[in-house]
A protein has these predicted regions:
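Short beta-strand elements of ligand-binding domains
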Residues: 1-13, 184-190
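Hydrophobic alpha-helical segments within soluble ligand-binding/sensing domains
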Residues: 9-11, 17, 23-56, 75, ...
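Loop/turn elements at helix/coil->beta-strand transitions in domains of secreted/extracellular proteins
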Residues: 19-21, 58-60, 86-91, 122-127, ...
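Extracytoplasmic ligand-binding site segments that recognize negatively charged/polar headgroups
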Residues: 27-37, 55-144, 215
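Structured segments of extracytoplasmic/periplasmic soluble domains
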Residues: 39-50, 54, 82-90, 148-155, ...
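Hinge/cleft segment of the Venus flytrap/periplasmic-binding protein
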Residues: 57-60, 64-68, 72, 84, ...
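Hydrophobic alpha-helical
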Residues: 80, 104-106, 111, 116-120, ...
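Exported/periplasmic ABC-transporter solute-binding proteins
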Residues: 158-165, 175-248, 255, 260, ...
């Protein structure tokens, strides 16, 4: 976890500046969140002729929120709402609170968005969302998400056109409990192996955090520090063997002393490239 204030998300620069060899390696949470939202919007636009299950002109979605206080969960909820136009500003940022139930579009936490395709305008509405916390207090709970989709589907029926989740664990629980049998696209995050495989069965898509690039960055930063060479060696600058990462798979923020792997949308167009997690990442395999 990146050193930061758990309430505000402000980075702990004292920790990140501990010494000259201190760096953080992770993934760009905001870029991934935006990408998930864009992936969902693109899917809706590409499938607009069939996605509105009851033909009411409203593209209704439900949202499984992992943990209302977790930075990644907050970012992903905001990313979806931003892309779909359902976000409402709260103190300078999109409100990430769960809406509860909003079938009539009257909530003050979200608003109705719009999507225009082929000259026709459709309303986009967050029908319901909740934090998936179980009775023991565990968040990101898959079983709770499975129960939630059964409750939502019983109440909203064919108003639900899209299912969205902050991660694949909850997403796959909802997919297996209801979405798959009802041909409702479900979108998650993490590119878990079961979710990637499920794309062939109708799972809408997921986001890969480029774990291979994260692993390489971590090992490379350590290696460079131990070898006493420039920290960028084999990362943005080729090493003696020619290993180097391209700028479309990582970014470095000098002010934050942080390397971030860039996320990738995994959809029906490319999921086969992600089925085997043991494949060596070729650009840095020399």
């Amino acid at each position: 976890r990146q050193p930061s204030n758990s309430s505000t998300g402000e980075l702990d620069m004292t920790a990140l500046n501990f010494n000259e060899n201190t760096y953080y390696v992770g993934f760009d949470a905001n870029q991934g969140a935006e990408l998930q939202g864009t992936m969902i919007r693109d899917y809706i636009e590409a499938n607009i002729d069939t996605i509105d299950r009851n033909g009411d002109g409203i593209i209704g979605y439900v949202l499984a929120v992992g943990d209302i206080g977790h930075n990644d969960s907050i970012a992903r909820t905001r990313g979806v709402r931003s892309a779909l136009g359902t976000g409402v500003d709260a103190d300078g940022s999109i409100n990430s609170e769960p809406v509860g139930t909003n079938t009539d579009g009257s909530s003050s936490i979200v608003q109705d968005g719009t999507i225009e395709v082929n000259g026709q305008t459709y309303t986009v509405r967050e029908l319901a969302s909740q934090e998936m916390k179980n009775s023991a207090g565990a968040t990101w709970d898959a079983a709770t998400a499975g129960n939630a989709i059964n409750t939502w589907s019983a109440s909203f029926g064919d108003q639900i056109d899209v299912v969205v989740s902050n991660n694949d664990g909850m997403g796959m629980s909802m997919f297996n409990a209801w979405s798959k049998d009802n041909s409702v696209p479900t979108f998650g995050y993490d590119a878990n192996s079961d979710a990637v495989a499920a794309i062939a069965e109708g799972y809408g898509g997921t986001i890969s955090q480029h774990a291979d690039v994260q692993a390489y960055l971590t090992l490379r930063v350590l290696r460079n520090a131990l070898d006493g060479v420039d920290i960028d060696t084999g990362i943005g600058t080729p090493d003696e063997a020619g290993n180097v990462l391209s700028s479309d798979v990582f970014t470095y923020n000098a002010d934050e002393r942080s390397y971030y792997a860039l996320n990738v949308a995994v959809t029906a167009d490319n999921y086969q490239d992600f089925l085997d997690s043991t494949v060596v990442y070729a650009p840095v395999s020399n």
